């Protein structure tokens, strides 16, 4: 049985003045799927991420998530609906501990009002306790159980990447968007990341992945969408994408006649 569609992107375009960064791109992500979004440098991958997650407002087209049109919703509203992301450039709070960084991620699900937090109401204290418990569990989940009290800025690069994933998961997402999570990783770290992404999917999350390492993408994704110069040029299974002439030409170029 085919899983229901979680995210539907239809004719999505993003323009900056006279520059078209994304041109009428359409694709779907189904629940429980790991979808790879690939393409050469400047293809529009991160622009697409930014349009989905509310960093950029689309010039045209629509993004529908779990039945809700995102339209002009603000970033925090999109997070509350169930979309979380990491970034190409690590964006942690360096002076905070690993545990504190993940606890911050849980704020997206807190229901205590500002006055309630100021007076430390019973609900606020309960949510604080639950947030710490969840953060501890997520650090263990990403393999950082012994790093919780270390400042984020002092962590090894690979652990900082994992910490970003833990913080994103702390928001309670239905869709996790990973923007080049293997950047700067050595082969063993990449293999561990592939295992982690698979476990994340097995826990019920849906994953949208941007990654330049083609071997990693082919290994971990269920389906791949390929962009070039802001347009979609292919959409299919990894084996199909590997043999697609348009994809090969986009990455390797076409010889002169």
Map each language-model feature to its residues:
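Glycine-rich phosphate-binding loops of nucleotide-dependent enzymes
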Residues: 2-257
């Amino acid at each position: 049985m085919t899983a229901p569609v979680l995210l539907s992107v239809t004719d999505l375009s993003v323009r900056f003045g006279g520059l078209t960064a994304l041109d009428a791109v359409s694709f779907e992500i189904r629940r429980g799927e790991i979808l790879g979004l690939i393409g050469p440098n400047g293809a529009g991958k991160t622009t697409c991420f930014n349009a989905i997650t509310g960093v950029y407002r689309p010039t045209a087209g629509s993004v529908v998530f779990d039945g809700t049109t995102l339209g002009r919703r603000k970033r925090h509203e999109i997070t509350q609906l169930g979309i979380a992301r990491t970034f190409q450039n690590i964006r942690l709070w360096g002076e905070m501990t690993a545990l504190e960084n993940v606890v911050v991620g849980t704020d997206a699900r807190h229901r205590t009002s500002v006055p309630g937090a100021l007076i430390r109401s019973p609900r606020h204290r309960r949510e604080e306790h639950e947030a710490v418990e969840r953060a501890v569990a997520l650090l263990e989940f990403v393999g950082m159980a012994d790093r919780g009290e270390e400042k984020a800025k002092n962590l090894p690069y690979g652990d900082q990447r994992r910490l970003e994933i833990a913080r994103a998961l702390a928001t309670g997402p239905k869709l996790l968007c990973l923007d080049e999570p293997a950047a700067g990783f050595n082969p063993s770290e990449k293999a561990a990341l592939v295992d982690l992404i698979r476990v994340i999917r097995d826990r019920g999350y849906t994953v949208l992945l941007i990654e330049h390492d083609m071997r990693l993408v082919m290994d971990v994704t269920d389906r791949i969408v390929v962009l070039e110069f802001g347009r979609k040029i292919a959409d299919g299974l990894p084996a199909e994408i590997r043999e697609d002439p348009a994809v090969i030409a986009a990455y390797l170029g076409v010889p002169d006649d």
